[in-house]
Regions:
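Phosphate/dinucleotide-binding and metal-coordinating scaffold of catalytic cores
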Residues: 1-253
């Protein structure tokens, strides 16, 4: 996002369709596939072999930020950690080999502590969650890390395409935008494993934020009356309780 682009075609030259198909079939447990809901046991991660980066996240408890409605309240609330925090301390490893396939047992290119939470608005209700990830050091201080060839930063988004069954819509939109303007987030496809369970194909995304390789504006200077800024339009209203169709089931017509 901003400056030199690192947009890449993620099907590497040494790979072929013939090589990929048998490996994919070997990792899939066909009897565990469901038409109406996700089953993490449908993929045997020990047999997973992919040209996409593999993101492994380990947590000590459920990731906070899942929405729920409480009796007597007309607006939604969000789950917190067992200590009442909105973010959970966790670890993340990224396996991203340059000249061979990626498997869960390969040496990680990135190994870091993180803070993580569920992100989104209505998308928080989807079966496939998206996550806000902050890379930190051992004492919890934000630590910039370069991930999948993108500019070093500490705030990232793991976007889980859900309604878009092609998984490509946001990925393509960001890449097209990046060819037309400077300030479009870089993106990378990846496969996510959470606590040993396969979660599917995700998109690792830069956030729109101030910094080198992001939006190149200076921090506010209290001695000057001119400054750069980013405007964020967010939803600050409390939504009433209502049923949400998350489109997980299909009907033949």
């Amino acid at each position: 996002l901003g400056g030199k682009k690192y947009r890449t075609h993620q099907h590497k030259e040494y790979l072929s369709v013939e090589d990929t198909i048998p490996d994919v079939q070997e990792a899939i447990n066909a009897e565990q596939i469901s038409e109406s809901q996700y089953n993490s046991e449908a993929v045997d991660i020990e047999k997973l072999k992919t040209h996409l980066p593999v993101v492994k996240i380990e947590t000590s408890e459920e990731i906070p930020g899942v929405p729920y409605y409480e009796e007597g309240y007309s607006h939604r609330k969000y789950t917190t950690t067992s200590e009442g925090e909105s973010e959970l301390a966790a670890t993340m490893q990224i396996i991203d080999n340059l000249d061979t396939y990626n498997t869960v047992n390969d040496k990680p290119a990135v190994s870091t502590s993180i803070r993580i939470r569920v992100r989104g608005n209505t998308s928080r209700w989807f079966d496939k969650k998206s996550y806000a990830v902050t890379t930190v050091d051992g004492d919890g201080t934000e630590q910039d890390r370069r991930i999948m060839g993108m500019e070093a930063a500490h705030d990232w988004v793991l976007h889980g395409p859900f309604l878009d069954k092609t998984l490509m819509r946001n990925y393509m939109a960001m890449n097209f935008s990046g060819e037309l303007m400077d300030f479009a987030p870089d993106v990378r496809f990846c496969e996510v494993i959470l606590n040993g369970a396969y979660q599917g194909v995700y998109v690792m995304m830069e956030t729109i934020s101030r910094g080198k390789g992001r939006v190149d504006i200076a921090r506010p200077n209290l001695t000057k009356n001119v400054t750069g800024y980013i405007v964020e339009i967010d939803n600050a209203t409390s939504l009433p309780v209502s049923a949400l169709n998350n489109f997980t089931k299909y009907v033949s017509v």
